[in-house]
Amino acid sequence: MISADMEGATGVTWTGDVVPGTEQWQRMRRLFTGDVNACVQGLVAGGATSVLVNEAHSAQRNLLLEDLHTSARLLTGRHKPLSMMQGIDSSVDGVVFLGYHTAAGSSGVLAHTYLENSITGVW
């Protein structure tokens, strides 16, 4: 399983890169899809026969469906009870956290954290 966020994906350097509808976001969608495909390809090369990809950024409609690796099974769209981990169950052998941002208070790109009772550093 891959839980794929966009804020730590290849090329992302500022907020405008991940805001749906912007020119920068359109460019980053291609790079994000490439990151996911590279991960899927690596998992398949390592023996995976099917890879669930839970898209986990913003409205969760960022990956380019027509370019997604054929071994990927995509879970997309909002209102998932388990949010970024939707799809996890006893059949999942492992999880890759791909493209996640750094934690609030760190010096990384787009650093923020969602905690159980609070939200910190949302831009």
Tell me what each language-model feature is:
Residues 1-18, 28, 32:
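N-terminal glycine-rich anion-binding loops that anchor highly charged ligand groups
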Residues 46-49, 70, 90-94:
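Short coil/turn connectors at secondary-structure junctions
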Residues 14-27, 113-123:
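A solvent-exposed, charged loop/short amphipathic helix patch at secondary-structure junctions
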Residues 69-89:
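A glycine-rich helix N-cap at a beta->alpha junction
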Residues 10, 60-63, 102-108:
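Short, well-ordered, mixed-charge alpha-helical segments that flank or form enzyme active sites
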Residues 23, 27-54, 60-63:
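Alpha/propeptide regions of enzymes that mature by internal proteolysis
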Residues 3-4, 54-55, 95-100:
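Short beta-strand segments
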Residues 84-123:
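Internal, conserved structured core segments that host functional sites
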